[in-house]
Amino acid sequence: MKKNRTQTVLISILMITTLVLSACGGQGSAHIKGNSASSVSSGSASDHSSQGSGSAETDPSQTPGSSSSGGSDAPANFSALKKTGSMDRIYAECFAVDYYEGGFALITIQDEGRFLLIPEESSVPSGVPDDVTVLRRNPKNVYLAASSAMDYFRALGALDHVRLTSTKKEDWSLPEVVNALESGDMLYTGKYSTPDYEQILLEKCEIAIESTMIHHSPKTKEQLELLGIPVLVDRSSYEPHPLGRMEWIRLYGLLLGCEAQASDFYDRQAALYDEVRSSLTETAESKKSVAFFYITTGGSANVRRPGDYISRMIELAGGEYIFSYLTGDGASASATQTIDLETFYAGAKDADIMIYSSSIGGAIDRTEQLIKKSALLADCKAVVNGDVWCADGSLYQQTTGTADMIREMNLILTGQADADSLRFFHKVN
C-alpha cells in the first residue's frame, strides 16, 4: 500500500510539473478520451460523426507535440468533418481508417477504440467525443511497448521517432534497434507494466504504443493517460491472416506521415506472396507435413496452435501443419501449447519436415543437438531423412518479413532451398 501511495504522489507531482511546463509554453499534455474506449469492430466510421454533439471543446494546446496556436483557422467541429473516403485494406481486419477533409483521419481499432489523427499544424476540432483519443500525425519521441510493431518503424526508416522501448537490448534481434540502444538514440524505460513514468515525461513522449499485454496491467494504461500520454493498443497479432498482420505497416505509415511509402512497401510484399501462392500445384494428398516446435527446459515440447500466424504461414506456403488437430484458436488464445514428448512424438514422428524454433532455447546446427534434447526424436522421419531446419530468432520480431518467410518455407517444402541464401532459416546437418 505504501508503495502504491508513493507512486500516486510521484505521478501527481509529475502531472503538476507537466501542466506548469504547458502553461509556460513547454510540453503540452494529451487530449485524453473520456470514460472508456468503446469496443468496436473494423468498418466504416462514417456514422460516428453524429456522436460529436454535446462534447466539451478541447484545448489544442493540450495535445503533446502540437503548437498551441494550431492552424490559422479556428478548429472545425468534429461533427462537421466531411468524409472523403476509407483505406482500402486487403487482408487486415482489426483496424479501419476513414479519411476526412483537411488531412484528418479517424482510426478504428477493434476492441480498442477510436483515434482522431490530426495534421501536425492543425488545431484540435471542437466537439470530439469522449471515446475518441486525439493523436497528432508524425509524433516524436514515441514510447513503444509493442515489440512486434518496432519492425514497422524500421522498415519505414522511422526508428528515429522511437525514443523509449519496454524491451531490453539483449532481447532484440533487430540490429538497427540494438545499435540505437547502444548509442543512446533509444532508451530502455522498464517493463511494459512498470515503465519509468518520470523518464517518459522528461523525454516528452507524445504517444505510447502498447501491445494487448497492457490489458493485464490496466492501471499502467490509466496512469499514462493521466499523465497526458495518449495510448494506442496494437492488435496486429490478432489478425487471422499473416498478410493482415503485416498490413498494419499502412496504419503506422499513416500515423508517421509516410502512408504512400508504407503502401508501396506493402504492395511489393503482397505481390511476392501472390507469386508464391500462384506457384502452388500440390494437392492435399501431396502436401508435405511440417512440425514447428522447440524443447523446453522441462523436457516438454512447445508447439504452435492451429490458426497461429506461424502455422498459417506453413499452410500458405503449401505445407500441412502436423498439429492442426490441437484445440484453440491462434488468433485469440495463446499462440503456443506445451505438450509432453510422448504426445509430440506421436504427432511428429511421421512429419516430412521439422522446423526447430530458436527464439527460446537457442539455435541448433546439428541433429545431435536435437537428439540430445530428446533421444525419442532420433527415429522421426524428418531426422532420419535429414530434413530438419532451424528458424532464426529474428523470425518473430521481423514483422514485415512475412512474405519472405512464406517464400522461404515454400522453398524448403519444395526442396528448392539454398541453405546459404535463406534469411530466416538454416539447415540442421
Regions found by a protein language model. Give the residues of each.
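Bacterial Sec-exported substrate-binding components of ABC uptake systems
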Residues: 24-150, 261-292, 417-429
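Extracytoplasmic ligand-binding site segments that recognize negatively charged/polar headgroups
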Residues: 140, 147-155, 165-176, 216-219, ...
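Structural recognition of the beta-strand scaffold that forms the well-ordered cores
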Residues: 141-144, 161-165, 207-211, 231-234, ...
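A short, structured surface patch at a secondary-structure boundary
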Residues: 105-201, 207-214
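Structured C-terminal subdomain patch of bacterial secreted/periplasmic proteins
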Residues: 239-267, 277, 353-429
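C-terminal motif of bacterial Sec signal peptides marking the signal peptidase cleavage site
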Residues: 19-23
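Flexible, glycine-rich surface segments
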Residues: 276-365
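Bacterial N-terminal signal peptides that target proteins for export
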Residues: 1-13
